[in-house]
Amino acid sequence: MQEILSAVDAELFGVWFLIGAALVFWMQAGFAMVETGFTRAKNSGNIIMKNLMDFCIGTVMFVLIGFSFLLGEDLLGFIGKPGFDIFTAYKDFNFSSFVFNLVFCATTATIVSGAMAERTKFLSYCVYSAVISALIYPIEAHWIWGGGWLAQLGFHDFAGSCCIHMVGGISALIGAKILGPRIGKFEKDANGKVIKVNAFPGHNIPLGALGVFILWFGWYGFNGAAATTIEDLGSIFLTTTVAPAVATVTCMIFTWIRYGKPDVSMCLNASLAGLVGITAPCDVTDAFGATMIGIVSGLLVVFGVWLLDYKLHVDDPVGAVAVHMMNGIWGTIAVGLFATSLAPGYAIALEGGSIKGEGLFYGGGFTQLGLQLLGFVSVAAWAAVCMVIVFTVIKATIGLRASKEEEIRGLDIMEHGLSSAYAGFEFGGMDFVDGDADVIGSESMEASVPALVKTSDAGDGKKITKVEILMKQERFERFKKAMNDIGVTGMTVTQVLGCGTQKGAPEYYRGVPMDIQLLPKTQVEMVISSVPVMDVINATRKALYTGHIGDGKIFVYDVEDVVKVRTGESGYDALQGEDD
């Protein structure tokens, strides 16, 4: 009976193993959404194409050589023996292991694209993505997961903080540094010293948030697919939930205190940072360890973004280096600090030789911590040296960076002939909402400075005046009713973007002050002749006034003449009639 139960259990976890692989594949969509949302609209199609191709190209390279380098017969602890068993011995081939390791390989390659987004040549991206999938990832992953020298020592990286996220993050840092920043990101003085950092807000934060939720969902497969018992799987799910949640709360509190408001995009990065940090120790730590890992991850991602912007002057549009490299390193080290025999996966790892002892904070001393430090340094050195060579060769041959014209116009149109990834949609168009719920300012309208306009009512001279008004979108319905009440029914309404900064109260995007922040506004144009201008101004102020900054502005112009296209009437007469 026990043999039957064991067989059933093995079959169930075999199915779960493949489901986990499918979840990891689904994470490709999450990476695509995060990178697209955190960058500008003119490069959206290019980013989607890169995320598609790094998986497809990676699959080809992994089939040809990557898989054998990773899981082939061990050669001196460094590399798997090259072979073509997938073609020559398909009947006995380990299909599940191939698919599982393939989707992990693709994750490493896709991390790099975010840090190098918006200015990398598409051909160059395809080349270095292929190299990562064929050589760089499979070899170092063999050291850890393929029976290589780190695995033999007892280095522990259960799901890839080191061999996937840190390697992808290091590749991203080196690539972004060699590539250079986006045009306008850093302002320099005559001596070449950076004197100002400019914020480039992502064009679609909701899309980025969707990507984060997709990634978090996929991470349950990323971390949990290799679990072999129900208890182990449950513990992994717990730590994979606690760490990112704590990281996000930590980041929210810190940015709220530091910048005056909780930073949305930074908190989204913090969720991913917590997931990266828990990836290596997820099976061997407990809830306390996951909490501590999450706290550090939440702070580390903010520090990482600041460090790259203000000290290293490396342009990373999506925070890939702070999320993956820094937290990949942290997660690797965290095994040596928080591994505990209380976790169900610890005994499994100890029996399999993939861990040598508990963490420093659980009485295990420095044994495991030393192994983790050795592994992180070794893998980091391998990735750094290889990627410097790869990027340098690409830069010297086919070129790494897109031209200035391509970058300014956008890679969608220049690289792919895609005029817009959002064809059929107009940027900035929003539904009008009623503004009755607006909070009125402390200062009454009557106490404010009265409006004085040097104009006259339409009389014998039939004076024509143009009134242009910029207002908050939510006040439009109130304004429209006010105009109807005084007899003004003709107007042209446009959705626009406007800016205005209150002195001493700047806004921040990812810790960078924003000099100009464009906000959705409604612009109304009216040409009037029979209604007194002061009536229009007074009614407008009454409708728009809240006492807060940003209530709007009224512009008054003299109009020389008006001609009605249909009848040819001009002046005052052109403004009369049902079609005006």
Locations of regions flagged by a protein language model:
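Glycine- and aromatic-enriched membrane alpha-helices
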Residues: 1-458
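Positively charged, small/polar-rich N-terminal and surface patches that mediate targeting and assembly
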Residues: 414-421, 432-580
